[in-house]
């Protein structure tokens, strides 16, 4: 169900939830919210749990770091509660963000922003073109590096020298990216693209029952988390 939600509706609901969670400083509200997001992801979403665990690991380490530093260097009056609140808040926000990332297709998200939230087509198509260029830039990076190795350019062993040597790779990549962007702009203008907001779409992103059910589910979780913070 979460995978079938309109990306704009999902984005608005997640943004509202994050803003609302920012006003609660007790540890129970973010903890209940985090557990609820994981439960929603388990029952109503299709994600790769292995990838989710790997992506969640840095946030988990960050939450542990927040807990430790606040516990050691915080005010003695409310050290434990503040430490738990900060660490659980990191987990709640990160799990909600990953839920959006793993259940939303980037192209559908941009199309939905244009159709539902009236994002400027100039900005939207610029983002789409940049997104499509990412695999091309990756291939060009390896091609340029292999070409330099064939010409006898050695890869430095020192991490600092390796970073400074990246400029020999980045300059050709940036030059190629500028040429591709210019050709893409000329091609879009030749096909009649003007950037006007009033336009027809071949692929329409609609709002349906899954959006109502998913929004209601997120609102119930948000209200339940707030109630848990008040009662516990």
Segments (PLM) and residue ranges:
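Membrane-helix interface segments
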Residues: 27-28, 47-49, 118-123
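Transmembrane alpha-helix interface motif
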Residues: 1-27, 33-40, 143-232
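Alpha-helical transmembrane segments and their membrane-interface exit regions
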Residues: 36-46, 61-67
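Short, aromatic-rich membrane-interface segments at the entry and exit
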Residues: 26-34, 50-55, 79-80
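Juxtamembrane/interface alpha-helical elements of multi-pass membrane proteins
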Residues: 55-160
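Membrane-helix interfacial "entry" motifs
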Residues: 2-3, 43-51, 74-82, 203, ...
């Amino acid at each position: 169900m979460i995978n079938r939600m309109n990306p704009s509706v999902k984005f608005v609901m997640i943004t509202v939830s994050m803003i609302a969670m920012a006003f609660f400083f007790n540890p129970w509200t973010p903890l209940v919210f985090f557990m609820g997001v994981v439960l929603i992801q388990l029952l109503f979403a299709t994600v790769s749990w292995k990838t989710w665990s790997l992506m969640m690991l840095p946030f988990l380490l960050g939450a542990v770091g927040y807990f430790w530093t606040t516990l050691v260097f915080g005010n003695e009056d409310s050290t434990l509660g503040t430490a738990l609140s900060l660490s659980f808040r990191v987990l709640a926000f990160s799990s909600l963000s990953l839920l959006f990332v793993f259940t939303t297709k980037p192209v559908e998200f941009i199309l939905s922003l244009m159709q539902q939230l009236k994002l400027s087509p100039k900005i939207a198509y610029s983002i789409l073109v940049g997104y499509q260029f990412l695999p091309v830039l990756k291939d060009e990076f390896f091609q340029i590096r292999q070409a330099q190795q064939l010409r006898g350019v050695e890869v430095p062993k020192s991490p600092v020298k390796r970073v400074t040597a990246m400029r020999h790779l980045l300059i050709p990549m940036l030059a190629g990216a500028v040429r591709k962007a210019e050709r893409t702009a000329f091609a879009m203008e030749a096909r009649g693209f003007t950037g006007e907001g009033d336009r027809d779409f071949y692929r329409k992103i609609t709002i349906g029952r899954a959006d109502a059910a998913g929004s209601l589910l997120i609102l119930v979780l948000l209200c339940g988390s707030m109630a848990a913070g008040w009662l516990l």
